[in-house]
Swiss-Prot record:
Catalytic activity: L-glutamyl-tRNA(Gln) + L-glutamine + ATP + H2O = L-glutaminyl-tRNA(Gln) + L-glutamate + ADP + phosphate + H(+)
A single BP term in Gene Ontology: translation
Native species: Neisseria meningitidis serogroup C / serotype 2a (strain ATCC 700532 / DSM 15464 / FAM18)
One Pfam family this sequence matches: Amidase
This protein's encoding gene: gatA
EC number: 6.3.5.7
First-level EC class: ligase
Protein purpose: Allows the formation of correctly charged Gln-tRNA(Gln) through the transamidation of misacylated Glu-tRNA(Gln) in organisms which lack glutaminyl-tRNA synthetase. The reaction takes place in the presence of glutamine and ATP through an activated gamma-phospho-Glu-tRNA(Gln).
Alphabetical list of HAMAP family matching this protein: GatA
NCBIfam families reported in the protein's UniProt record: gatA
Active-site residue list: K76, S151, S175
GO cellular component: glutamyl-tRNA(Gln) amidotransferase complex
Keywords, sorted A to Z: ATP-binding, Ligase, Nucleotide-binding, Protein biosynthesis
Binding partners and assembly: Heterotrimer of A, B and C subunits.
Protein name in UniProt: Glutamyl-tRNA(Gln) amidotransferase subunit A
Amino acid sequence: MTQYTLKQASVLLQSKQISAVELASAYLAAIAEKNPALNGYITIDQDKTLAEARAADERIAQGNASALTGVPVAYKDIFCQTGWRSACASKMLDNFISPYTATVVQNLLDEGMVTLGRTNMDEFAMGSTNENSFYGAAKNPWNPEHVPGGSSGGSAAVVAARLAPAALGSDTGGSIRQPASHCGITGIKPTYGTVSRFGMVAYASSFDQAGPMAQTAEDCAILLNAITGFDPKDSTSLEREKEDYTRDLNQPLKGVKIGLPKEYFGEGNSADVLTALQNTIDLLKAQGAELIEVSLPQTKLSIPAYYVLASAEAGTNLSRYDGVRYGHRAAQFADLEEMYGKTRAEGFGSEVKRRIMIGTYVLSHGYYDAYYLKAQKLRRLVADDFQTAFARCDLILAPTAPTAAPKIGADASPVETYLSDIYTIAVNLAGLPALTLPAGFSGGGLPVGVQLVGNYFAEAKILGAAHQIQLNSDWHGKRPE
């Protein structure tokens, strides 16, 4: 019962072939069996889950259900939810029970979706491997010696392991797309401002965006329909008419122009990644898509620009964790200043501290112009590159990561880890939508994904292209043993 896609589960629930309680119980049993080794979930509450499932069954019986009523979903630990611990995988918030619910979570609760639990992540979403979690690293379900990716690694792992039909993640520099690639699932980062950030704990506010993670592009489209929309509680939320993101799922690819950025197909990629790209190119050609070379010359500037800007925003956002009103507080201190210092020293992990220090440095007097202001200018150049490319093509095909998932504990420096985000970060700098879908396997049997990038508000076009690829391939249907 836990093998269903979100769409399949929806059909079975609406036709009353299964009940929401039966489905939730099956997932809870699978979680109890497999999660201790996977560590994908960090918070489970069976009583809350089953109460939501019973309410969903009542709603279905009364005939006022939505297509998502009764379908289980997992939430990355970055989303606040009333009555649930919302820790952001940090010691700083280990004891924080949220008094309110994030808009995206509330949207899915209003649809009648059933909360399975809260998934592991890199602390405060800062990381690419899920090793920065206070609760220990989540494992890759294809090989537990390897990382699931980050920062939404737990969400990717539980969907891949069939411990949830779908999950919500967040993407600041690739945190939906990179773990989706490493775990062999589909995940989409929408256009910045399309999905409300209210109740999603802030890392870098001008980058953060929530999005769905599931087995298929069709599932992601269905979830995206439910979570998008203007929210007056989020000042960056865009006022636009609601879209149907499933509208292009059956659109053929004939004549669609796909750009191949020459800077993304170089020697920095592993042979496995190049094979996955070629697999996708062959599928696109077979369906009549037109492939053209484009250039994104500022790609090499995206990493330094991102880590200056995101760290600056993180340093500001994380100043709220001081031990005064909520979260961890040091047990012993002589005065207020010492309490602040000890609380933050004890509560934050090493990667979070590193980014706070980088952010404080680049915003400091004498360095603001040299780093922060220059990075903002580079951000515009990166965005302009994409607009030049989209004048010639409809979508861009690119790698998601230069390699398959690395091993847990791989001796990589912070800079090497940052460089693994080279293909995802530029999309966040520009605020564009992008989707990762499975496109093959490494020689070691690990999934490898590719990403489709679109212009602003082209989510339906991206999802349609991904769906057509998945109708003609079966990588998304593979699952770990």
